[in-house]
Amino acid sequence: MKHEIKHDPAFRALTPKWHHGYRFQYEPAQKAHVVLYPEGMIKLNDSASLIGGLIDGERTIAAIIAELQREFPNIPELGMDVDDFMKVAKEKYWIDLV
């Protein structure tokens, strides 16, 4: 089933989890959070790091957005930013959406 990404309650009801073999962690040598995978590493920017840190296989996309909105209430496009991150992460096989 294909979901429309932006403002789609069905999409936001999905739960992201890191794809098998992929791991989110802080990498001191990079001074940044990264996604490690068998073939390499992806260095994340600050926004992606905040989102990635909330991916635990239990929170839905909507719950991640709600938590970030509590922390950053003055960012109206935050939900769309999270949607965009999830879309890219899914396309690049960093995460699975269940």
From Swiss-Prot:
InterPro entries: PQQD (IPR008792), PqqD_bac (IPR022479), PqqD_sf (IPR041881)
Pfam family, one: PqqD
GO molecular function: quinone binding
Function: Functions as a PqqA binding protein and presents PqqA to PqqE, in the pyrroloquinoline quinone (PQQ) biosynthetic pathway.
GO terms (BP aspect): pyrroloquinoline quinone biosynthetic process
Coiled coil: none
Quaternary structure and partners: Monomer. Interacts with PqqE.
Keywords, ordered alphabetically: PQQ biosynthesis
Family: Belongs to the PqqD family.
Domain of life: Bacteria
Pathway: Cofactor biosynthesis; pyrroloquinoline quinone biosynthesis
Protein name (record): PqqA binding protein
